[in-house]
Structure formats: structure tokens, C-alpha cells
């Protein structure tokens, strides 16, 4: 069988509400999720031996490959699919790590899609979906990599029709551990982060066919509840947010996930590209991407 390849697109949390912490210690979330046009690329060379080789500009940041989520997802699927055909993976790493954009989760989801193709399985086969869920909280949403409202601990996905949103994404190349941000949030097991009245309110999102302006206005009404605790963990997040907010033509700036990646939305591609150029000149050490979310 010839080699198979998949993109592993960056995940962006346009909004992220922490509803509360469950008695089992996990956090219940509600998030509007989009996907960017920047990505890692994962290639599978089908064969008898499972392996993973790293390449690309971000390879040195990934550390030991033995506990990489690509291999974890593969092993979990192999436990559920007899005689699963695997092989050698090559990960061309471009997205920053520990960055709040689901890079490792997107890679794992890409691995599951590749394995599904190599074994003539549907990507929504229950065994594939279960392997995604057990690999990590962000892997289920990255499996289809389509805009949605994500709830629970990441397992409940409600599709959205999201227009193309011109955007700039910035990471200061400072890793932020998700567990540290949730620790800074400081919720006890069983504690709600929102009031009961707010919990009962259903957030209304624009209907299918709504414009980018409608969506930006709706997203503005939301928040990222992890922004404040992330600032306690790593103050450079504030520098990134201020730099994005100061760009000409910016409509919204916010942190994605648990950080440190932040994004800004614009009315058009020209403003986004111009903003990215300004940031690259002012902060040559930062990772900056201009493109679109969808």
C-alpha cells in the first residue's frame, strides 16, 4: 500500500466557558471551536512495525516520541480493531507545542483518520471515536476538524455552519501546561464556575448562512474563562493580547484554549495580513500566522 497523508489543523477556541469541575476532577466546558488553515502533516507508510519519526521546524520541541499521542491513539485503536494495519508515521511538525491549539491532539486525530483509511474503516466508526476519546479531551473534536459547539469534557459535538473568518494567530513560543492553568483557576471537585441561572441559559449562535460580522459580534459576547488563570501562570499572554488588540482593523482578540496562543479576528484578509506583518517586525521571536478560521 502506498503512503497516506493527512493534515492536522490547528484548533481554535473562539469561546471557552468552564461550566464547573466534576466530582471526578474533570472540568465541564462549553466552547465554540473553529479550525485554522495552518497545520502539521502526518504521513503513514503502512507496514508491519509501528514507529514515529519527527521532522519539520517544530520537531525539536516535541521531546521523546515514545509517549506521543500519535502512538497512544494507534495503540488504543489496535486494542479495539483486530489485526489493525499500522506502520511508520512521519510527523512534519509546524504548530507550536503546549500552545492551546490542540497540536498534539490534531496529530493524534490525523493518525486515527489515516488508520481508518488504511483499514477501510469509517472515521466515525465507534471504535475510532472511542480511541479518540481515550487518547485525550481535544482529540474527538479534532477527528472531524469541523466547526462546532463542544461541551462536556470534549466528547459532545454540535456542528456549526461557520463562515470564513480572517484571523491572525500568535504564540510567543512559551509553552503553557494545561494542568497549571486549570490549577490556577482553582475550582474544587463538584464546584460550579457559573451560576445556576447562567447554566440554564442557552447561548444562541448565529443561524446557518450568517455573515462573518454576525459571528464576530456573537463571539464577542462570549469569553475564555481560562484567560485570567493563564495570565497568572505566564504573563507573556498579556503581552500577546495587547499586541493583537492594538493592530489596525482588529475586531476581536482573545486567547485560545489554555494558551499561550492568542488570535485576532478581522473584517478582511488584507487587514489580517497587514497585522501579521506588523507583529513579525515588532516581535521576530514570536510564531505568527495570518490566514482564516472556518
Curated annotation (Swiss-Prot):
ATP binds at residues 96-106. It catalyses: 4-CDP-2-C-methyl-D-erythritol + ATP = 4-CDP-2-C-methyl-D-erythritol 2-phosphate + ADP + H(+). Pathway: Isoprenoid biosynthesis; isopentenyl diphosphate biosynthesis via DXP pathway; isopentenyl diphosphate from 1-deoxy-D-xylulose 5-phosphate: step 3/6. One of its GO terms (biological process) is terpenoid biosynthetic process. Pfam families: GHMP_kinases_C (PF08544), GHMP_kinases_N (PF00288). Keywords: ATP-binding, Isoprene biosynthesis, Kinase, Nucleotide-binding, Transferase. Catalyzes the phosphorylation of the position 2 hydroxy group of 4-diphosphocytidyl-2C-methyl-D-erythritol. This is 4-diphosphocytidyl-2-C-methyl-D-erythritol kinase. It comes from Rhodopseudomonas palustris (strain BisB5).
Amino acid at each position: 500500500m502506498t503512503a497516506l497523508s493527512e493534515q492536522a489543523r490547528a484548533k481554535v477556541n473562539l469561546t471557552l466557558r468552564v461550566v464547573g469541575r466534576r466530582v471526578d476532577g474533570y472540568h465541564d466546558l462549553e466552547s465554540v471551536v473553529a479550525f485554522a488553515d495552518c497545520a502539521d502533516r502526518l504521513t503513514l507508510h503502512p507496514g508491519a512495525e509501528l514507529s514515529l519519526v519527527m521532522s519539520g521546524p517544530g520537531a525539536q520541541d516535541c521531546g521523546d516520541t515514545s509517549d506521543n499521542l500519535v502512538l497512544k491513539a494507534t495503540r488504543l485503536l489496535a486494542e479495539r480493531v483486530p489485526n489493525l494495519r499500522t506502520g511508520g508515521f512521519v510527523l512534519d511538525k509546524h504548530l507550536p507545542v503546549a500552545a492551546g491549539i490542540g497540536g498534539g491532539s490534531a496529530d493524534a486525530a490525523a493518525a486515527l483518520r489515516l488508520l481508518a483509511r488504511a483499514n477501510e474503516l469509517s472515521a466515525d466508526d465507534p471504535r475510532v471515536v472511542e480511541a479518540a476519546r481515550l487518547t485525550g479531551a481535544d482529540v474527538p473534536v479534532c477527528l472531524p476538524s469541523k466547526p462546532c459547539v463542544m461541551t462536556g469534557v470534549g466528547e459532545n459535538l454540535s456542528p456549526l455552519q461557520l463562515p470564513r473568518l480572517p484571523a491572525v494567530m500568535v504564540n510567543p513560543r512559551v509553552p503553557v501546561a494545561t494542568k497549571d492553568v486549570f490549577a490556577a483557576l482553582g475550582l474544587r471537585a463538584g464546584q460550579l464556575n457559573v451560576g445556576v441561572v447562567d447554566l440554564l441559559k442557552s447561548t444562541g449562535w448565529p443561524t446557518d448562512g450568517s455573515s462573518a460580522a454576525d459571528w464576530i459580534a456573537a463571539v464577542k459576547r462570549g469569553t475564555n474563562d481560562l484567560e485570567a488563570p493563564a495570565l497568572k501562570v505566564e504573563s507573556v499572554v498579556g503581552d500577546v493580547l495587547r499586541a493583537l488588540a492594538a493592530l489596525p482593523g482588529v475586531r476581536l482578540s482573545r486567547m485560545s484554549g489554555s494558551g499561550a496562543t492568542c488570535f485576532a479576528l478581522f473584517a478582511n484578509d488584507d487587514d489580517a495580513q497587514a497585522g501579521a506583518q506588523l507583529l513579525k517586525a515588532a516581535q521576530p521571536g514570536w510564531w505568527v500566522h495570518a490566514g482564516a478560521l472556518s
